[in-house]
């Protein structure tokens, strides 16, 4: 009964996506896009080198409703519910809105470019295979390794955070018990496979959407003085008064921008999931369109309401203020209104959101490692799948990273959190910038080879200019990160803070130089890019190079071609 209900939802969503993309998708020049071609049964994968489809491929089991909810709430978790406390304390309410709005446009432009690439090349490993194809194989390797590593360490990161959130209830017992509970749950979901990931994210994302909407409504009531137990009365915009509105000035804005990037990391998972989505040419672009609502609802609206009901100078907002417990500012907002029971309910939501991020991270890391092996960037054993199409060895290695979380039992939880976070944070900036650069290169190759934009199955609504903006934002984000790393807020400059903030950069550079040295790779020349390689279904046939032979060179009246006419044909063909 329940499965039939979900099948009906999937069918209706798919029909809605088809209608939306075929009839109402608009480009930046105001023209309608062409109808998407029906993909063939075979799934064409590409990499460096290109490998034909074989039995060692991922299966397309993510349904339209899965893709929709992954796009809306897939990676909403620690960054929003916990990291927003640091953002509010470091930058104040105005800096939060400005930073998240600007970084939000950065994400929108990036994911729109990714949707264009994913629609024509829905491949395993998604975006960093584009880096190898359109930028440099060494860059694809370096970014791919860092992307895998960043999500692999996110698993123990979330396992480390979970007990700190549970300590809100003054939980007793060893931390390792709570780590083990969540560790086992994540392992069980991974054993379930792609279906498990999709179903868990579907329900947890619904929970997060309902919770955030509920928080927004409650915050309006609190700010208006409608809660009888809140002795503050009508709050209004009193927390937006100077000097709290722009804490720490420009440095505070830079610090919040860095937090915003971390909070929005994982948005590109829609592109990674393309390799296991049913009908990715249609579901991926349609899912990407939901990202706008994710950013607007979860971040802009929710954080604005948070700034109205929680003062930025309140002690305990920063994660470093408490060594054994993490209290979300969303929970603090409810506590300040003296509402009983509800803080615990909100804390449960945040705890489950942590599980959601850990689940998404293990999925992303295992699929990234699978793609690295498939493209010759990692040992071939990680390219193997079981009969259900699950990369079992890649999953096993990824899950082993979760054991790092047990170091919290030794009393180094806070320090471990910081170092793991350092690997995750900056890598997101490199990923987004590389996606935009690959899209620019793709468009250049498309133009040089005299292709028409109308022939693309999906076009980025921001065009190539959106990707140029994305590359520029990447440079500015790296500068902001460097500035905050050298001059941290509330501290004197020290090497530990700097390396925690910028450790991802040397990892990327070392990986790039090493691969380039040992494999002697070179930057990809635009005119030599084979646009048909790796294209999906009918798109591959449409992109095959056509040899135009002048009709007059062939002697039609003759039954047998002369040597001279054949030489002319061969000459024109070459």
UniProtKB/Swiss-Prot annotation:
Molecular functions per Gene Ontology: amino acid transmembrane transporter activity
Listed Pfam families: AA_permease
TM helices/strands, residue ranges: 69-89, 94-114, 173-193, 202-222, 291-311, 391-411, 412-432, 470-490, 498-518
Signal peptide interval: none
Biological processes annotated in GO: amino acid transmembrane transport; meiotic cell cycle
Entry membrane topology: Multi-pass membrane protein
Subcellular location: Membrane
CC terms in the record's Gene Ontology section: membrane
Main location: membrane
Listed PROSITE patterns: AMINO_ACID_PERMEASE_1 (PS00218)
Alphabetically ordered keywords of this record: Amino-acid transport, Meiosis, Membrane, Transmembrane, Transmembrane helix, Transport
Taxonomy, superkingdom: Eukaryota
Family note: Belongs to the amino acid-polyamine-organocation (APC) superfamily.
Name of the protein in its database record: Probable amino-acid permease meu22
Organism: Schizosaccharomyces pombe (strain 972 / ATCC 24843) (Fission yeast)
